[in-house]
Design a protein with these regions (language model features):
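Active-site glycine/GP-rich loop and adjacent strand/helix microenvironment
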Residues: 1-207
Length: 207
């Protein structure tokens, strides 16, 4: 197989790049023409490394598992200036995360999506807690969303998986040897995110 397109998290395509180099294979021999990257934050520096090494177009793709997964919005290879939202299927809004007030296009706030064509499980004004703003269309007529700047809650995205501190706390509380006091250390090692949880032990805990 010689695929033209790969759909992947940016950290994994960089890990693939490292494997090419480890095996002394020129990544430019790959058949890839487009790398659709999403499910975790990535930077313009990461895009540049992907494009300079593999020689494909690296474009940003945004999705929500609660709505459709990947494909709520996608960058165009012509402009690469932010994902265009598929407004035929999703109605986007940006609100003030504190008050819920709808903000005009161009102002930063929390994204809100309503599905327009989903039949089995329509979703109305879903708040994914992602912070961005709506911008005019460029290469496509549909509006763009700026790259997500952060979140209005404390969720972490690790290798494309949503991780909440409350989930970690739930596991800790099941162990009677551990106190409910912990620190989460999130770092990137060799392209991939890693989590270390430092937990206090109870004074009366048996080793």
């Amino acid at each position: 197989f010689r695929p033209d397109v790969i759909f992947v998290t940016p950290s994994y395509i960089l890990a693939i790049l490292d494997e090419f180099r480890a095996q002394e294979v020129d990544p430019r021999q790959s058949s890839l023409k487009i790398a659709m990257c999403g499910a975790e934050p990535w930077t313009n520096a990461m895009r540049t490394e992907i494009e300079d090494s593999f020689d494909p177009h690296a474009i940003d793709n945004y999705g929500l598992s609660e709505i459709i997964g990947p494909g709520v919005s996608c960058e165009c290879i012509e402009s690469k200036d932010g994902p265009h939202i598929w407004e035929d299927h999703f109605y986007p809004e940006v609100i003030d995360p504190a008050t819920g007030k709808v903000l005009p296009d161009g102002e930063f706030g929390e994204l809100v999506f309503t599905t327009l064509t989903k039949e089995a499980m329509p979703i109305v004004r879903y708040r994914p807690r992602d912070l961005s703003r709506l911008l005019p269309g460029t290469a496509r007529s549909m509006r763009r969303m700026e790259k997500v700047a952060g979140r209005s809650d404390d969720m972490m995205i690790v290798r494309g998986v949503n991780v909440f501190p409350s989930q970690i706390e739930e596991i800790i509380l099941k162990d009677e040897r551990l106190a409910p006091h912990f620190v989460i250390e999130l770092r990137r090692a060799e392209r991939l995110d890693q989590i270390t949880v430092v937990v206090e032990s109870r004074l009366d805990a048996e080793s």
